[in-house]
From Swiss-Prot:
Additional information: Appears to be selective for zinc, not conferring resistance to cobalt nor cadmium.
A Gene Ontology term for the protein's cellular component: plasma membrane
Record-level GO BP terms: zinc ion transmembrane transport; zinc ion transport
Name of the protein: Zinc transporter ZitB
UniProt keyword annotations, A-Z: Cell inner membrane, Cell membrane, Ion transport, Membrane, Transmembrane, Transmembrane helix, Transport, Zinc, Zinc transport
Chief site of localization: membrane
Native organism taxonomy: Bacteria, Pseudomonadati, Pseudomonadota, Gammaproteobacteria, Enterobacterales
GN (gene name): zitB
Record-stated family: Belongs to the cation diffusion facilitator (CDF) transporter (TC 2.A.4) family. SLC30A subfamily.
Residue ranges of the TM segments: 21-41, 48-68, 90-110, 122-142, 160-180, 182-202
Key word Kinase present: no
Bilayer topology term: Multi-pass membrane protein
Length: 313
């Protein structure tokens, strides 16, 4: 029986993530003040809805930026994985905030149907167009580039996407009000935009809760991983007791591997580690190698897939 673990890390994507968040925070915070004032002056709920999203965005971007900074702290004896999970927690809080603000906007829109208020279409249009441009800039800052975005940047981008949709909705409502004078267009567009944002927020909430509950990554099929290891690594007879979870954006795995006693134990261990890295991007794996079938009380976890279909070469 043998244990091994491998671990590598890189901070370059985190640096890029932090830079994205900082620039988007500057753009969003600056324009939020303009939109809040404009929303009150014009009397437009669609603008106030967009301003509400921008207010949430500003806090969300700041929180996400702080989380990325904290996540860079090195591991300690007490926090052995460092602070990587803090970014997931920030994404969870961001998703909750987005759900709450969306519900409040829908509630206010319903109130507007009961007691309509005058809306100044011209001012509403000017501010909505400016808001759209600011949101496009923020969204581009968060999304451009090919490197991996972490869950916080995804969360922040969803907030900004909500704002972008809000600005489009405000422009459509402003056009209707300018052309026809029909003010119910304002709360109607607010509700439609809010429902679109709510759908995205729900997806983000599910992803962050899955990570906080240490669920396996949705993209990883554990049964297939076990089958492939038994089929593609000749010495592997059985893979069991597999645990996979996420720490920040990094997948972490522990597993038991029953093997034919190898001529070179360390070479086989190294082969398994490289296999997990190359095929599943798992940089941190703790592997327990066994020469006999495992008889521990919890060794048959995930044993639904037979590990005996393997090839000898």
């Amino acid at each position: 029986m043998a244990h091994s673990h491998s671990h590598t890390s890189s901070h370059l994507p985190e640096d890029n993530n932090a830079r994205r968040l900082l620039y988007a925070f500057g753009v969003t915070a600056g324009f939020m003040l303009v939109e809040v004032v404009g929303g009150f002056l014009s009397g437009s709920l669609a603008l106030l809805a967009d301003a509400g999203h921008m207010l949430t965005d500003t806090a969300a971007l700041l929180f996400a930026l702080l989380a990325v900074q904290f996540s860079r702290r090195p591991p300690t004896i007490r926090h052995t994985f460092g602070w990587l999970r803090l970014t997931t927690l920030a994404a969870f809080v961001n998703a909750i905030a987005l759900v709450v603000i969306t519900i409040l906007i829908v509630w206010e829109a319903i109130e507007r149907f009961r007691t309509p208020r005058p809306v100044e279409g011209g001012m509403m249009m000017a501010i909505a167009v400016a808001g759209l441009l600011a949101n496009i800039l923020s969204f581009w800052l968060l999304h451009h580039g090919s490197e991996e975005k972490n869950l916080n940047v995804r969360a922040a981008a969803l907030h900004v996407l909500g704002d972008l949709l809000g600005s489009v909705g405000a422009i459509i409502a402003a056009l209707i009000i300018i052309w026809t004078g029909w003010t119910p267009a304002d709360p109607i567009l607010s509700i439609l935009v809010s429902l679109l944002v709510l759908r995205s927020a729900w997806r983000l909430l599910k992803d962050s809760v899955n990570e906080l509950l240490e669920g396996a990554p949705v993209s990883l099929d554990i049964a297939e991983l076990k089958r492939r290891m038994c089929r593609e690594i000749p010495e592997v007879r059985n893979v069991h007791h597999v645990h996979v979870w996420m720490v920040g954006e990094k997948p972490v795995m522990t597993l038991h591997v029953q093997v034919i006693p190898p001529h070179d134990h360390d070479a086989l261990l190294d082969q398994i580690q490289h296999y997990l890295m190359d095929h599943y991007q798992i940089e941190h794996a703790t592997i327990q190698m066994e020469y006999q079938p495992c008889h521990g009380p919890d060794c048959h976890l995930n044993e639904g897939v037979s590990g005996h279909s393997h090839h000898h070469h």
